[in-house]
């Protein structure tokens, strides 16, 4: 693509991209750890009761590389044991547009007999030396609480350590699988791609050396002849400056390289309206007709659970017959009406949990198709859809994370069994066609870990989980290949399977099961924005401006009120600012769950010299005004600040804004303010406003429809 942009202009435009120092740091580490001559590998394992560090240098090593595209090069390193014929294949991807590298390990038995035991396989095992001030930034997971995704910190002194894992086998239950290791003026982002039970440990020794280890929480297994397994994916990214820069590099990296692409177009999240599946088709059609009649900018219509089997929904997963009393003609009349108006259809499923008494429960007669819980942990067996305890009870977190049943005798469809995976893939693929689906919503309301471990034998611990997770990725990939238009909504009790692998294929449109009110939504956004750019939360009534603004993310879910004109106005306002949610994120206040404070954040798009600040005055806050200090502005540039509510406008330099701050007044209690800022035109500096680059071209870059290389090719 030739956009007619001078090279020097493109370099000015994208000066916010990774620095030379960051790219150099990454290159040095990659050469030392992944180079053709290096044996200083970033992984470890035990084999036959010996640590890999004691023998890996004696194994045969092969190296190859392959350029995948303009920004990615694949490096493959193979280590082979001459005695047992075990082969380890490390496939890494090195990025030329980010200071990042990621890798997966594969273990294959090329021998004619079982291997010795492979134990404690850690695809990440690296050390950092020197007297540095280590601080780990990480986040809580999604546990149906007000502090879901809350930012966490751990400062390391001599002898300090921290061990993290999600609990229950869903990757973002108790903790998120993203970490920012801050070393003062530089640091490393670490992300794990494993939709099961990962673990991560950080330990500081007596000489202030820090060791970081991550992998599956349990591996103790032998491989049969010709058998192969994979590990969790590990991503590392190097940054310099403040740790918020590292998090923003991660956001940009995800948008560039780990973003779903329906119809080969980078995903921009829609405005969605949802309703319950237990309502009738006539009810849904009436709502859709209202959307069409009033030309509301709602792109997706979402039908949730209870459209199948019998009531209640949580006791009928496994009976996927459409309820004819509600939908006598199925879903095609609904999807047809949506498609004819240029809109799309989303439908809920939970196909991996199988309830007793449903047709799929009979699949237990097929060997290894359904996994049993065994004795399980009695405290983790939920009956109904609540625990009978408050969210503040310390037992809540453990019970929610590790819930192994909702309905008595729940079983787990074992997609790790090839025929079972094919059965489910074909079933879902058929429903995409039959129902006219544009988005497949996959829920997953039980923690699978105890099912997996109950199925393992003592010399194959971890194998059931490995096969299950491998097959989950294979199934999603095949669905996306068969139906290139399809979007996958990854729910899992609200946001409990968010990791580097899932966000590449799916999006969490319901990021937590506890979006109780505006306060909760603000707290959830504050935390999750720092790590993952694409997600949405529960819908707000469109006329409730405070709640709707608290719900705004890279996409938006709404519910109808009574005034369609007001609904259109606020949705139009959202569409004007939606692009900023794809920019760099900066918290401007401390994280706080209290109702008597204000919370604010900033989204900045330096590529176009624009951004916005959102401020929320909570219901018990006495602060009518708050002074905020935006980040990452051009100190010498002049900015115009526009308040979308009052139409008030002001001009200040970037330096004045960052050093002296500006005051936001919010009279309503509760209330919110949105301030949009824009660099003033200066043709000596702001070349991209002088007509040589259209706004359309810039916004194509922001949505990643084109790459930086497209610009540089001019």
Regions found by a protein language model. Name each.
Residues 16-203, 207, 217-219, 638-646:
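Polysaccharide-binding surfaces and accessory modules of carbohydrate-active proteins
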Residues 18, 231, 446, 472-650, ...:
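Active-site-proximal substrate-binding groove within the catalytic cores of carbohydrate-active enzymes
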Residues 105, 226, 301, 338, ...:
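Conserved, mostly hydrophobic/aromatic
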Residues 201-212, 643-663:
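Solvent-exposed beta-strand/loop surfaces of large extracellular or lumenal domains
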Residues 221-240, 670-678:
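Short Pro-Gly-centered flexible turn/kink motifs
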Residues 266-426, 439, 451:
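Aromatic-lined carbohydrate-binding/catalytic grooves of carbohydrate-active enzymes
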Residues 323, 327-330, 334, 374-545, ...:
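Active-site neighborhood of glycoside hydrolase catalytic domains
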Residues 652-697, 701, 706-709:
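C-terminal beta-strand-rich structural cap/linker in extracellular carbohydrate-active enzymes
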């Amino acid at each position: 693509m030739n956009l007619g942009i001078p090279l020097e202009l493109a370099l000015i435009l994208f000066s916010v991209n990774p620095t030379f120092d960051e790219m150099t740091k990454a290159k040095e580490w990659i050469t030392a750890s992944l180079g053709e001559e290096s044996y200083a590998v970033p992984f470890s394992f035990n084999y036959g009761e010996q640590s890999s560090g004691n023998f890996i240098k004696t194994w045969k090593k092969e190296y190859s590389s392959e350029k995948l595209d303009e920004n990615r090069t694949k490096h493959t390193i193979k280590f082979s044991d001459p005695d047992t014929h075990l082969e380890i294949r490390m496939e890494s991807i090195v990025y030329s547009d980010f200071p990042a590298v990621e890798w997966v390990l594969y273990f294959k038995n090329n021998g004619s007999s079982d291997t010795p035991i492979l134990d404690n396989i850690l695809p990440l095992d690296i050390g950092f030396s020197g007297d540095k001030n280590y601080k780990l930034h990480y986040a809580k997971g999604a546990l149906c609480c007000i502090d879901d995704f809350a930012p966490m910190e751990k400062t390391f002194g001599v002898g300090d350590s921290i061990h993290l894992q999600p609990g229950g086998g869903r990757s973002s239950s108790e903790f998120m699988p993203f970490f920012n290791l801050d070393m003062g003026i530089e640091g490393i982002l670490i992300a794990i791609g494993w939709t099961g039970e990962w673990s991560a440990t950080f330990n500081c020794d007596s000489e202030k050396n820090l060791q970081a280890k991550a992998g599956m929480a349990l591996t103790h297994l032998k491989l049969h002849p010709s058998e192969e397994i994979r590990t969790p994916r590990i991503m590392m990214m190097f940054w310099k400056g403040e740790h918020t820069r590292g998090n923003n590099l991660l956001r940009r990296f995800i948008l560039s390289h780990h973003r779903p692409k329906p119809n080969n177009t980078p995903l921009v999240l829609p405005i969605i309206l949802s309703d319950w599946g237990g309502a009738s088709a006539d009810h849904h059609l009436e709502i859709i007709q209202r959307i069409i009649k009033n030309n509301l900018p709602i792109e997706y219509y979402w039908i949730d659970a209870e459209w199948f089997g019998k009531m209640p929904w949580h006791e009928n997963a496994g009976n996927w017959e459409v309820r004819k009393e509600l939908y006598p003609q199925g879903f095609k009349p609904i999807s047809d009406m949506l498609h004819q108006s240029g809109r799309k259809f989303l439908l809920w499923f939970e196909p991996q949990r199988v309830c007793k008494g449903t047709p799929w429960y009979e699949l237990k007669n097929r060997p290894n198709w359904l996994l049993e819980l065994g004795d399980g942990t009695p405290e983790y067996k939920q009956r109904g859809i609540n625990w009978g305890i408050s969210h503040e009870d310390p037992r809540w977190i453990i019970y929610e994370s590790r819930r192994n049943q909702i309905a008595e005798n729940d079983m787990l469809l074992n997609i790790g069994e090839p025929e079972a995976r094919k059965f489910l893939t074909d079933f879902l693929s058929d429903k995409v066609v039959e129902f006219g689906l544009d988005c497949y919503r996959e829920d997953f309301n039980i923690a699978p870990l105890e099912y997996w471990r109950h199925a393992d034998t003592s010399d194959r611990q971890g194998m059931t989980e490995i096969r299950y997770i491998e097959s989950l990725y294979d199934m999603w990939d095949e669905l996306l290949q068969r139906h290139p238009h399809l979007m996958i909504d990854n729910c899992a009790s609200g946001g409990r399977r968010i990791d580097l692998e899932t966000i590449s294929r799916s999006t969490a449109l319901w990021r937590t099961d506890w979006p109780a009110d505006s306060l909760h939504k603000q707290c959830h956004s504050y935390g999750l924005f720092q790590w993952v750019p694409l997600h949405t939360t529960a819908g707000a009534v469109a006329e409730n401006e405070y709640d709707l603004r608290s719900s705004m993310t890279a996409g938006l879910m709404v519910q109808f009120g009574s005034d369609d004109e007001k609904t259109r106005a606020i949705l139009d306002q959202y569409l004007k600012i939606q692009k900023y949610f794809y920019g760099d994120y900066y918290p401007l206040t401390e994280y706080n769950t209290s109702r008597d404070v204000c919370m604010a954040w900033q989204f900045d798009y330096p590529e176009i010299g624009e951004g916005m600040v959102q401020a929320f005055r909570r219901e018990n806050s006495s602060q009518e005004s708050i002074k905020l200090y935006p980040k990452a502005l051009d100190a010498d540039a002049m900015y115009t600040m526009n308040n979308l509510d009052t139409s008030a406008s002001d001009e200040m330099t970037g330096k004045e804004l960052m050093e002296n701050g500006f005051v936001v007044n919010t009279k309503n209690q509760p209330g919110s303010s949105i301030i949009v800022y824009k660099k003033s035109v200066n043709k000596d500096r702001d070349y991209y406003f002088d007509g040589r680059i259209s706004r359309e071209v810039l916004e194509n870059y922001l949505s990643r429809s084109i790459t930086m290389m497209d610009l540089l090719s001019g």
